[in-house]
Amino acid sequence: MAAAARGSGRAPTRRLLVLLLLQLLWAPAGVRAGPEEDLSHRNQEPPAPAQQLQPQPAAVQGLEPARAEKGLTPVAPVHTNKEDAAAQTNLGFIHAFVAAISVIIVSELGDKTFFIAAIMAMRYNRLTVLAGAMLALALMTCLSVLFGYATTVIPRVYTYYVSTALFAIFGIRMLREGLKMSPDEGQEELEEVQAELKKKDEEFQRTKLLNGPDVETGTSTAIPQKKWLHFISPIFVQALTLTFLAEWGDRSQLTTIVLAAREDPYGVAVGGTVGHCLCTGLAVIGGRMIAQKISVRTVTIIGGIVFLAFAFSALFISPESGF
């Protein structure tokens, strides 16, 4: 009985020892797991805020899914100065184009070249007159732009403010001329051009008579003419020379030179040519009717206001802005 009692008392003791050993084995692992988990949480950095991606071209968007599959971060678009420079160049061209076409229109409507084209179109072929006048005006515009562009060797700040002062002087002068001008000024200009063209026609007819055969002797006393006159219409040459000489030193030529010195030269050349084409085309198509309807006094006053507006705009635009 005593042996059985000792055997039964050892069994619970063994069980307690086994439980204590198991507890000692498991306890360090549990204690170590806690700090490691804490340290892992501490080492984790906070998630970076999501970047708002700008819409990109199709070629770039096609590359983004491939980069995402590889686990790479999408590349943000890089903006260069080329786009800004191109936008500024386009804006400068548009500004120069609008300035040139508006100034040419208010300067040429009712001008001497306008009446020359109008009167010659009533007497001769309109296309021939338009071609001769436009060739002269295009050549004059290109020469004026070259003269103005040659001044770019001077620092822009000087040419900018000098051209602004010239615009102000032209504007004040045109306003003064317009206010002092009589309502019949356009008619007087028209009559002056008619007299000049009549004189040219008489000289041309006299030349033709001298080139004709002599009735008494039956021989020709022709005056030698230049060979190129046989291939080019005399009307074309007359329209070209009259328009070129009338435009040389005119207010529109000086204005084109001033604009080319401060604006984009290509915009000034294109805008000036388009402006001349509109005015000359209007004169050729309308003829005398438009010449009599146009009030030179009103056009001159409007032109003075436009010139002063360009001069006033220089107070708000920096010379370094590029337009």
From Swiss-Prot:
It is found in: Golgi apparatus membrane. Residues 35-60 are annotated as: Disordered. The keyword Electron transport does not apply. One of its GO terms (biological process) is calcium ion transport. GO terms for cellular component: cis-Golgi network membrane; endosome membrane; Golgi apparatus; Golgi membrane; lysosomal membrane; trans-Golgi network membrane. Residues 35-44 have a biased composition (Basic and acidic residues). It catalyses: Ca(2+)(in) + n H(+)(out) = Ca(2+)(out) + n H(+)(in); Mn(2+)(in) + n H(+)(out) = Mn(2+)(out) + n H(+)(in). Residues 34-89, 148-151, 249-266, 320-323 are lumenal. Expressed in mammary epithelial cells (at protein level). One of its GO terms (molecular function) is antiporter activity. Residues 1-33 form the signal peptide. Residues 184-211 form a coiled coil. Keywords: Antiport, Coiled coil, Golgi apparatus, Membrane, Signal, Transmembrane, Transmembrane helix, Transport. Residues 111-126, 173-227, 288-298 are cytoplasmic. It is a multi-pass membrane protein. Residues 50-59 have a biased composition (Low complexity). It comes from the Eukaryota. The chain crosses the membrane at residues 90-110, 127-147, 152-172, 228-248, 267-287, 299-319. Belongs to the GDT1 family. Putative divalent cation:proton antiporter that exchanges calcium or manganese ions for protons across the Golgi membrane. Mediates the reversible transport of calcium or manganese to the Golgi lumen driven by the proton gradient and possibly the membrane potential generated by V-ATPase. Provides calcium or manganese cofactors to resident Golgi enzymes and contributes to the maintenance of an acidic luminal Golgi pH required for proper functioning of the secretory pathway. Promotes Ca(2+) storage within the Golgi lumen of the mammary epithelial cells to be then secreted into milk. This is Putative divalent cation/proton antiporter TMEM165. It comes from Mus musculus. The lineage of its organism: Eukaryota, Metazoa, Chordata, Craniata, Vertebrata. The gene is Tmem165.
